[in-house]
Regions:
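Feature for exported/extracytoplasmic and membrane-associated proteins, marking the mature portion
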Residues: 1-203
Length: 203
């Protein structure tokens, strides 16, 4: 994450441009994700890439950038955002499309609200984003549900379960109409200041 090649002597003399927030772990993480070391950017290099090639995937509701660790700079573009899932898949709106009379009433109420023609910009945007999220959940969940069981064995750690969901998502690429995908998984806990041997053994 250097701005330019830097020697210790140059650093001490202040003779070179240095990364913003040098020695800050959070800044270093952001700079790796943005590929911009001299300022704080909200757009990452996978996001910039997706802005260019996202249209190669034919489902407009599901981004080619899929995160299993929430919001991140790396997959955020100027136009494209990431689609966040969990180790269990896409999270549905509670009871939407579920069985039973209560679920049916809720589903019809939500669909009715989202189908209204809103004049206020915030209302229009919220309705469009909510409709897209619901449709994306249906598309993603159906694609995963239609897959045969994986033969690859995964352990029961949180990280391994996330990799299992990534494997399922890749296996469902034809149903999801995906030609290009990126996946973001975060594994923390590496900032060991003491008891390094003991702490690293637990990693």
């Amino acid at each position: 994450t250097l701005v330019e090649p830097t020697t210790l002597d140059q650093y001490r003399r202040g003779a070179v441009a240095l990364p913003l927030g040098l020695f800050s772990h959070s800044d270093q993480s952001m700079q790796w994700q943005s590929s911009v070391p001299d300022r704080r950017e909200a757009v990452g290099w996978a996001g910039r890439m997706a802005d260019v090639i996202q249209t190669g995937n034919c489902d407009p509701n599901i981004s080619m950038n899929i995160s299993l660790s929430g919001s991140n700079v790396w997959q955020s573009g100027k136009v494209t955002s990431h689609y966040t899932i969990t180790e269990n898949g896409s999270e549905a709106l509670w009871d939407y499309g579920g069985p039973g009379a209560n679920a049916m009433v809720r589903t019809e109420a939500v669909d009715s609200l989202l189908a209204l023609q809103y004049r206020h910009l915030f209302e229009k945007t919220f309705a469009a984003r909510m409709r897209g999220a619901i449709d994306a959940n249906v598309d993603f969940s159906n694609a995963i549900a239609a897959l045969p069981p994986l033969t690859t064995q995964f352990s029961n750690t949180s990280l391994s379960r996330k990799f299992r969901m990534i494997a399922l998502t890749i296996a469902a690429r034809q149903a999801l109409c995906m030609k290009r995908q990126t996946f973001f998984v975060e594994a923390g806990g590496w900032d060991h200041h003491d008891e390094v041997v003991l702490n690293q053994a637990a990693m």
